[in-house]
A protein has these predicted regions:
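Charge-rich, well-structured scaffold segments of protease-associated domains
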Residues: 1-116, 122-124, 133-134, 138, ...
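Short amphipathic alpha-helix segments
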Residues: 174-182
């Protein structure tokens, strides 16, 4: 804690270190742009949340990184890093009184901050299907098909998470079984649900032979369409067991417990116990699953990002409208 408090309250932020770290980040960005799957992830965020921070890569762009001066970085640190904008979470073999005393000793004189205003996500006026193409000469086409989801405070969050588990999480998921095991279209195929402070998304991803991109997109949409009709009690039960088992397994790690406590306190001003979360996961019904599937897995609202040897959006817009 002594080292961490010194880093937070008294960072050196030298010009030399500033320039060196900028070079490191520029190399990280170059690596991301060179990885088609990572680039597809970047493009789908831009497609879901265009022209706003939520849709931009957290690493920035080459131009934005180069433009950051040492003084602007120091100003950002002074505004954002302070007790009003921080949570100190401690997990492990330590008495509560000792943790409080150490925190007061090391952070008691931490100067006040003036955190930047938070701006809510603005969804586009038109929620019609959108397609973004990243033209690359690749041996494999990478596609991400997404739709807006629910936020981390939405009571349907657990329904959406379990829907995602049934759809594309793990080797027994629908997408894995249909697209890899049955049809042999893809090696890497999965879906994931994201829940942020005021928005969310559900995204399906796969990498396929460029000549099979049309077939893949048709099969993928068929799977998304079926789940609101035939999601089963057995699938839900398996997804609930998977989710609760994974939660308890993760919390065997002390660092994960620390993140569990700190993250909830910082974002929600409350900390749910694991038991409370498990109860909420187990309370989800098959009706809840089908309901969120009908509402959010609607082809009228699909967003598609593709990285591969393509230029025209037209053929893919037609496939989304089919």
């Amino acid at each position: 804690m002594d080292v961490l408090s010194d880093m937070l309250q008294n960072p050196i932020l030298s010009e030399y270190e500033h320039q060196r770290e900028k070079n490191v980040i520029l190399e990280e960005l170059a690596m991301t742009y060179d990885q088609p799957d990572a680039y597809a992830d970047m493009l789908i965020d831009q497609t879901l949340w265009p022209n706003q921070p939520m849709g931009r890569d957290v690493g920035g762009t080459k131009d934005s990184v180069i433009s950051i001066s040492k003084n602007s970085l120091a100003d950002y640190h002074n505004r954002q890093y302070g007790p009003e904008n921080s949570v100190i979470a401690i997990a492990g073999n330590i008495a509560h009184s000792v943790a409080i005393n150490e925190t007061e000793k090391l952070f008691g004189n931490w100067g006040k901050a003036s955190p930047l205003d938070w701006h809510r996500v603005q969804l586009p006026e038109s929620n019609a299907p959108r397609v973004t193409i990243g033209n690359r000469r690749t041996d494999q086409a990478h596609l991400a098909l997404a739709m807006n989801g629910v936020s981390s405070t939405d009571p349907r969050k657990y329904s959406m998470s379990l829907l995602n588990t049934i759809l594309g999480e793990g080797m027994s998921s629908r997408l894995f079984m249909e697209m890899r095991e049955k049809r042999g279209l893809a090696y890497d195929v999965a879906s994931h649900a994201s829940h942020y402070k005021d928005c969310g998304a559900l995204t399906a991803y796969c990498g396929v032979d460029p000549s099979k991109i049309d077939e893949t997109l048709v099969v993928l949409q068929n799977e998304l369409g079926k789940i609101s009709i035939d999601a089963s009690e057995e699938e839900l039960s398996n997804a609930q067991a998977f989710a609760t088992g994974r939660l308890y397994l993760r919390l065997e790690d002390t660092r994960a417990v620390m993140s569990w406590l700190g993250g909830q306190e910082l974002l929600f001003n409350e900390v749910k116990t694991p038991e409370k979360v498990v109860d909420e996961v187990r309370s989800v019904t098959i009706g809840d699953i089908r309901s969120v599937a009908r509402e959010f897995l609607d082809p009228r609202f699909y967003k598609l990002a593709i990285v591969g040897p393509y230029r025209s959006q037209g053929r893919f817009k037609k496939l989304l409208a089919a």
